[in-house]
Amino acid sequence: MDGHLRIDDLVDATRQLVTVESPTDDLAACAEVVEAAHELSRAWLSKPGRIERHGGRPVWRWGPSSPRVLLLGHLDTVWPMGTLERIPFAVDGDRMTGPGVFDMKAGVVQGWAALSMVSAHPEGSCGMLLTTDEETGSMASRDLIAEAITNSEAVLVLEPSADGALKTERK
């Protein structure tokens, strides 16, 4: 990004993530969405992220392994493959809909936007971790998450809640 956030860029990046279906139980689909996130994030971040595997599952990381501030999210969804045929990504006024928009691909894009504003500052120690097993309880990534947050002063979970409240824990 050029230092200016544009709503069209946020919507377009969300659309691109949503149109890569990623049900938790489909490892190939989860690997594909991690690849898509890796490519999309390059437009937002000053340094590239990295794709890793943990517990047999793909994850995406950006920044130091133990950042002061960690943005935590996931790229898997509860929606089965083929859902996009019935419920396509759509924008109606100021509302985006489609499988994974709310939980939580729009939050991932918002995280990249936030990082784009701080990632150029050398004193900032921010990182991001995106897993692909949250919808089934984060069993494979639990140790990775625990390790990542150990030295962090703050962890911000990018997943929204239905009533707009701040989430303070994760499955």
Name every feature range the model reports, one short phrase each.
Residues 2-101, 122:
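Acidic/His- and Gly-rich active-site-bordering loop/insert found
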Residues 104-171:
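Acidic/histidine-rich catalytic neighborhood of metal-dependent amide-processing enzymes
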